[in-house]
């Protein structure tokens, strides 16, 4: 067991987990976070910087960090990697033109030393939109099956309809416990 795993284990005993939510701009990160918090999702504005939410799930206090996905903000993502217990990466399933850009960013993230072994949940968001790619198509495009150094899961969802979020979070909670 490495030092990072040991530190993460200590945090789990305290009943806390730090979750990082990343993805390209307009993927639906903030909408997902608000839906999980049971907040109004009718008016969402692009995140400039970050949002932090505390949620209680299964006796755990989750600190969820939603970081803006604009190209100008992405270089700062690494400032938030310390003590991350799980990564939620959000994909806009209806925006196939930006899938390769999203793949590049995810690949870069997974190569970061501070993210070694951190469980990955990919939310294939916006499944309610016409032309949205299925989760298995996105998994194939992102080459998720080649990931061997961490547990991962892809979950089809629609933040606006609230579908798939519960299932994704249940998987994630099993990983951080």
From Swiss-Prot:
GO molecular function terms noted in the UniProt entry: GTP binding; GTPase activity
Any one of the GO BP annotations: protein transport
Superkingdom classification of source: Eukaryota
UniProt binding sites for GTP: 23-31, 125-128, 159
Location of this chain's protein in the cell: Golgi apparatus membrane; Cytoplasm, Cytoskeleton, Spindle; Nucleus; Cytoplasm, Cytoskeleton, Microtubule organizing center
Major localisation: Golgi
Keywords tagged on the record: Cell cycle, Cell division, Cytoplasm, Cytoskeleton, Golgi apparatus, GTP-binding, Lipoprotein, Membrane, Myristate, Nucleotide-binding, Nucleus, Protein transport, Transport
Hydrolase is among the record's keywords: no
Membrane topology type: Peripheral membrane protein
Lipid-acceptor residues (N-myristoyl glycine): 2
InterPro entries named in the record: ARL2/3, P-loop_NTPase, Small_GTP-bd, Small_GTPase_ARF/SAR
One GO cellular component, as annotated: nucleus
Pfam families tied to this protein: Arf (PF00025)
Stated role: Small GTP-binding protein which cycles between an inactive GDP-bound and an active GTP-bound form, and the rate of cycling is regulated by guanine nucleotide exchange factors (GEF) and GTPase-activating proteins (GAP). Required for normal cytokinesis and cilia signaling. Required for targeting proteins to the ciliary membrane by releasing myristoylated protein from unc119 cargo adapters into the cilium.
Classification via NCBIfam families: small_GTP
Entry similarity comment: Belongs to the small GTPase superfamily. Arf family.
PANTHER family: ADP-RIBOSYLATION FACTOR-LIKE PROTEIN 2-RELATED
Name the record gives this protein: ADP-ribosylation factor-like protein 3
């Amino acid at each position: 067991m490495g030092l990072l795993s040991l530190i993460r284990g200590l945090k789990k005993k305290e009943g806390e987990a730090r979750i990082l939510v990343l993805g390209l701009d307009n993927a639906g990160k903030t909408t997902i976070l608000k839906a999980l918090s049971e907040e109004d999702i009718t008016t969402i504005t692009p995140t400039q910087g970050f949002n932090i939410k505390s949620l209680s799930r299964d006796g755990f206090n989750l600190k969820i960090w939603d970081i803006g996905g604009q190209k100008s903000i992405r270089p700062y993502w690494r400032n938030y990697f310390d003590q991350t217990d799980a990564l939620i990466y959000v994909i806009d399933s209806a925006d196939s033109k930006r899938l390769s850009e999203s793949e590049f960013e995810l690949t870069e993230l997974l190569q970061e030393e501070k993210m070694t072994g951190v469980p990955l949940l990919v939310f294939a968001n916006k499944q309610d939109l016409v032309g949205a790619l299925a989760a298995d198509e996105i998994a194939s495009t992102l080459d998720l099956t080649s990931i061997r150094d961490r547990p991962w899961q892809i979950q089809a969802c629609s933040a606006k309809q609230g579908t798939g979020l519960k299932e994704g979070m249940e998987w994630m909670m099993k990983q951080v416990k």
